[in-house]
Design a protein with these regions (language model features):
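Polybasic, lysine/arginine-rich low-complexity segments
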Residues: 10, 26-27
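Short, contiguous, well-ordered secondary-structure segments
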Residues: 50-56, 89-92, 269-282
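A cross-kingdom marker for long, charged
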Residues: 260-322
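Bacterial N-terminal signal peptides that target proteins for export
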Residues: 2-14
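Structured, acidic catalytic/metal-binding patches in enzyme active sites
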Residues: 29-45, 52-265
Length: 322
C-alpha cells in the first residue's frame, strides 16, 4: 500500500499508537563503473536474503551505508540480512528520517489527532463522496470500530488510520521496525544519531494537503484494503532480496496515478535529503543511513541521485573493504 511505504515513519507509527513511511528476483542493476565482481564480496548467503543495503563512497573518503527499511515488521520477518548489522558496526553515527527518539512521546499522537480532526461544524461524511463514506463505515464495522468516532477525522487521518489498523491485524508493529530496532540500539550504545527532517515538518505535510488530495489518498486506501495481506508479503520478500525494481513496481503501481502526492511524500523529500547526504560524503563522514525502502527506488530515488552526484554506489555483497 502507498501509505505503508511512502508516508513518513513517525506519523505512521503515531497512528498505530492511537489504534500507527517501500519477490525474490534480482537486485537493481548497478552501473558498470560502480560494480565490483560478485566474488569479491565478503558476505556469503545465510538464508536472510540479500537485503536493501548499499555502500556509497565519495572521493573525499566519506562512506554511507544506505539501508532501505520497512517501518513496521512482524517477528517472523527477522533476522535481517547481515548487511544491516555490518553497517551498524562499521558506521560512526546513525542517520534516520527523524532524530533517534524524536516524536516518541504522547504529545505527538495528541498533536496529530488535533491536526487530523474536523471542526465541530463538519465531518468526514460531509467532505467525501457517498461511496467512500459507505466504504469507511463498512470497514469500521468489520474492524470493530465506531464509525461515528471516525467521522470526526479528516480523510488523510482516516486513510493512515485504516492502513495502520490493517497492518496491526497482520501482527506488524513499529516496535519491530528496522528504524526502531537500530534507533533504540544506538541510544543504548551511545552512538550519535541525527535526522534528515523533523516531526513538525512531517505533520505539516498532511496539514497542507488540499481536500482533493486527501480524498485521493482515502480513495486509494479503500481500493487497496482487500489486498493488504498479500501485497505486504510480496513487499517483504522483495525488500529482503534487495530487489528495487520489484519494490518500485509494487509500491507505486497505484501511487503514480497521483503525481502530486508522490511528489509531496517522496520526490520532494528525496531532493532535500540528497543535499544532506552529499554533504556528509564530502565531509568524509561514515554513517549508517536508514530510510524507507521506497526512497531508494526509481530514477528519483536516492541511489540514482547519489550516482548522479558522482558517488560510487554498490550493493553491500559486492563490497570487499566493508
Amino acid at each position: 500500500m502507498f501509505g505503508s511505504s511512502v508516508l513518513p515513519a513517525r506519523v505512521f507509527n503515531a497512528l498505530l499508537a492511537l489504534c500507527l513511511l517501500l519477490s525474490a528476483c534480482r537486485k537493481e542493476p548497478l552501473s558498470e563503473t560502480a560494480s565490483a565482481p560478485a566474488e569479491a564480496g565478503i558476505f556469503i548467503p545465510d538464508g536472510a536474503g540479500d537485503g536493501c543495503v548499499w555502500v556509497v563512497d565519495s572521493e573525499q573518503k566519506g562512506r554511507l551505508y544506505l539501508c532501505g527499511t520497512i517501518h513496521i515488521l512482524r517477528e517472523g520477518d527477522y533476522p535481517l540480512a547481515p548487511g544491516y548489522e555490518a553497517a551498524y558496526m562499521f558506521s560512526e553515527k546513525l542517520v534516520l528520517e527523524l532524530p533517534p527518539g524524536e516524536g516518541s512521546s504522547p504529545e505527538l499522537a495528541k498533536k496529530m489527532s488535533q491536526l487530523g480532526m474536523f471542526s465541530a461544524d463538519t465531518s468526514l461524511e460531509a467532505n467525501v463522496g457517498a461511496e467512500a463514506w459507505t466504504a469507511v463505515q463498512a470497514w469500521a464495522t468489520r474492524r470493530g470500530l465506531e464509525a461515528s468516532s471516525i467521522n470526526r477525522f479528516r480523510p488523510w487521518f482516516v486513510s493512515i488510520l485504516m492502513t495502520a489498523k490493517e497492518y496491526a491485524v497482520l501482527g506488524a508493529t513499529p516496535d519491530l521496525g528496522v528504524d526502531k530496532h537500530f534507533s533504540d540500539r544506538a541510544q543504548a550504545d551511545g552512538k550519535p544519531g541525527e535526522g534528515l527532517e523533523t516531526t513538525d515538518f512531517q505533520l505539516q505535510m498532511f496539514a497542507a494537503l488540499t481536500n482533493r488530495q486527501q480524498q485521493e489518498l482515502l480513495d486509494q486506501t479503500l481500493a487497496e484494503l482487500s489486498t493488504v495481506a498479500g501485497e505486504y508479503e510480496k513487499m517483504i520478500q522483495a525488500w529482503k532480496q534487495g530487489d528495487l525494481s520489484a519494490l518500485h513496481a509494487m509500491l507505486f503501481r497505484e501511487a503514480e496515478k497521483h503525481p502530486d502526492l508522490m511528489n509531496l511524500f517522496l520526490t520532494a523529500r528525496n531532493l532535500v535529503w540528497i543535499d544532506k547526504l552529499d554533504a556528509m560524503l564530502h565531509r568524509g563522514e561514515k554513517a549508517m543511513v536508514l530510510v524507507g525502502a521506497a526512497h531508494l527506488t526509481g530514477d528519483a530515488g536516492l541511489i540514482e541521485l547519489l550516482k548522479k552526484r558522482g558517488h560510487r554506489v554498490r550493493h553491500y555483497r559486492e563490497v570487499q573493504d566493508f
